[in-house]
């Protein structure tokens, strides 16, 4: 029996729209949490001024794919929780949590694990290797009940954790702090993101945190750039069909029309969450769209 499951969805608003593969990974986080009667919450990296204008558009897209009622308010929510969008979704805003980040930055400084260069602050991997060795075990789960291990040799390189003289913290540092603060148990993402696990594992161990489980799911591919929601709706595909298609790629029934998340959750098995890849199938999406169109009520 698994412990209480807590997952999180992390948005980096570098673009006003994300492609379908990103939203599929978000949905897998929700399916895993809800299957085990757990929680999932939203975290927003809003510290780059150039990306601020994209947040509202991303929230609009997100709430079309993930029902707002499925997102929970984080526990231990001492600071940085705001309500966003027309549905007032609780979300952690990174820009409001600097005091906590600075606390842990100071801890790393006390352990002489930081290097200051120009206006940036780097984690000193060379010093870490002196203390802990140059091999790091990346524990991950290919399925919620099946663990794996990848051992990597660490390069003697530095990686940045803060810029602007410590006034802006980078995602792979801030997310580690927040995941610990909010008791996140599982990080769910596509297998192509496994390299992100290296700095996150290093930081977790250097700070004495309990490592979350890393669960990897399939990568959605396409012979062309993956479509965004706005691209598909412009062709007449409904949000309901897009959502149903994504549900189906997770349950293994991509041509089955799903009218609700609860219906899809009944077909969901954690065993279906495996690393690998699959291709976006526009014809299957069109088939789902046709089904919804044929089953519309006259008043719809």
Give residue spans per PLM region.
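N-terminal Rossmann-like or analogous alpha/beta NTP/dinucleotide-binding catalytic cores
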Residues: 2-120, 195-209, 241
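Short, histidine-centered active-site or binding-site loop motifs used for metal coordination
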Residues: 9-13, 44-46, 177, 181, ...
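Short, mixed-charge, low-aromatic patches
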Residues: 13-20, 47, 151-161, 201, ...
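Intrinsically disordered, low-complexity acidic/polar segments
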Residues: 16, 130-132, 294
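Short, charged/polar micro-motifs that form catalytic or ligand-binding hotspots
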Residues: 19, 190, 232
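Long, contiguous hydrophobic alpha-helical segments, chiefly transmembrane helices and signal peptides
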Residues: 40-42, 173, 187-188, 199, ...
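Active-site cores that bind ATP or allylic diphosphates and position pyrophosphate for catalysis
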Residues: 94, 107-229
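Catalytic adenosine-cofactor/nucleotide-binding cores of aminoacyl-tRNA synthetases and other
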Residues: 195, 201, 205-300
């Amino acid at each position: 029996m698994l412990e209480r499951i807590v997952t999180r969805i992390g948005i980096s608003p570098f673009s006003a729209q994300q492609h379908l593969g990103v939203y599929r990974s978000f949905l897998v986080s929700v399916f895993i949490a809800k299957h085990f009667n757990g929680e999932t919450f939203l975290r927003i990296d809003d510290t780059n001024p150039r990306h601020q204008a994209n947040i509202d558009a991303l929230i609009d897209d997100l709430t079309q794919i993930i029902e707002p009622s499925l997102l929970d308010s984080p526990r231990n929510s001492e600071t940085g929780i705001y309500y966003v969008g027309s549905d007032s979704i609780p979300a952690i805003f990174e820009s409001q949590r600097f005091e906590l980040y600075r606390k842990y930055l100071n801890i790393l400084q006390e352990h002489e694990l930081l290097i200051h260069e120009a206006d940036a602050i780097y984690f000193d991997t060379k010093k870490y290797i002196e203390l802990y060795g140059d091999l790091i075990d990346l524990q991950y789960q290919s399925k919620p009940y099946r663990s794996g291990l990848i051992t990597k040799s660490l390069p003697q390189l530095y990686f940045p954790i803060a810029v602007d003289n410590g006034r802006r913290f980078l995602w792979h540092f801030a997310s580690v702090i927040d995941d610990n603060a909010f008791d996140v148990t599982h990080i769910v993402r596509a297998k192509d993101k496994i390299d992100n696990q290296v700095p996150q594992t290093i930081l977790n161990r250097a700070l004495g945190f309990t490592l979350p489980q890393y669960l990897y799911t399939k990568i959605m591919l396409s012979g062309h750039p993956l479509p965004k929601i706005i691209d598909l709706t412009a062709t007449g595909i409904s949000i309901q069909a897009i959502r149903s298609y994504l549900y189906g790629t997770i349950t293994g029934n991509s041509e089955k029309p799903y009218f609700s998340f609860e219906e899809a959750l009944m077909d969901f098995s954690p065993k279906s969450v495996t690393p690998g890849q699959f291709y976006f199938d526009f014809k299957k999406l069109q088939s789902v769209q046709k089904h919804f169109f044929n089953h519309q009520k006259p008043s719809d």
